[in-house]
Regions:
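Conserved beta-strand hairpin/beta-sheet module of binuclear metal-dependent hydrolase folds
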Residues: 1-45, 117-128
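Well-ordered beta-strand scaffold positions
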Residues: 2, 81, 94, 101, ...
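Short Gly/Pro-enriched turn/cap motifs at secondary-structure boundaries
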Residues: 6-8, 87, 107-109
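Hydrophobic residues at beta-strand termini and immediately following loops
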Residues: 7, 90, 180
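Active-site HxH/HxHxD metal-binding segment of metal-dependent hydrolases
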Residues: 11-12, 23-26, 33-104, 185-189, ...
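Divalent metal-coordination and catalytic microenvironments
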Residues: 18, 30, 56, 68, ...
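Aromatic/hydrophobic pocket-lining residues that form the small-molecule binding cavity
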Residues: 31, 62, 149-153
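Metallo-beta-lactamase
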Residues: 47, 102, 112-205
Length: 205
């Protein structure tokens, strides 16, 4: 049975714990600032942390990596272009297994060059700072690209089934999770636009 927990962090960040309760194996996605809360849950559920997966290299998503690796023999996972310290490099289409749970890596540059999303058993999508509830990630920071964001959103994420659940990296929306279908319908950044129009839209103040 899958154990899935969204943890509210400081600064509107979310961390996630994904575990196979039958095997006790677990992964943390985006350790963020409060590793202590993550450790508390892992110990209470008697879980073995095998992976710490970062959706991208910004410090508000990676700040807890060192504390978690000091407590658990877990591998830090990041996209191969990431500049953070990691043990396992991944790229588009790679599969990670946590017990019997499959995590599919979807490479989604745009917010950063190393941004990834994770599709959990084809049911849940952890989107980091690529897609939020009602918003998408900004592209005006170092390594950002509106052109890449367009292709990540429209040619990758919006091709997933409408009932796939969306779990973002920040609590920026009217609720803490959504679905691909709901985002297609209600997210103003995902309304049909040409690439040129999207780039102009993202440049608006």
């Amino acid at each position: 049975m899958i154990f899935f927990k969204q943890i509210q962090q400081h600064g509107d960040n979310f961390s996630y714990i994904i575990a196979d309760e039958d095997t006790g194996e677990a992964a943390v996605v985006d350790s963020s600032f409060n590793a202590g809360e993550i450790i508390k849950v892992l110990k209470a559920k008697k879980l073995r942390l095998t992976y710490i997966i970062n959706t991208h290299g910004h410090s508000d998503h990676t700040a807890g990596n060192a504390e978690l690796t000091s407590m658990f023999p877990a591998k830090i996972v990041a996209h191969k272009l990431s500049r953070i310290s990691f043990d396992l490099a991944v790229e588009d289409g790679d599969l990670l297994t946590v017990g019997r749970i499959q995590l599919k890596v979807i490479y989604t540059p745009g917010h950063t060059v190393d941004s990834i999303c994770l599709l959990v058993d084809n049911e849940k999508l952890l989107t980091g700072d690529t897609l939020f509830v009602g918003e998408c990630g900004r592209t005006d920071l170092a390594g950002g690209s509106s052109k890449s964001m367009y292709h990540s959103l429209f040619n990758k994420l919006m091709k997933l089934d409408d009932d796939v659940e969306v779990y973002p990296g920040h609590d920026y929306g009217v609720k803490t999770s959504s679905t691909i279908g709901e985002e297609k319908k209600f997210n103003y950044t995902l309304q049909p636009r040409s690439l040129k129009d999207f780039i102009e839209f993202m440049a608006e103040p």
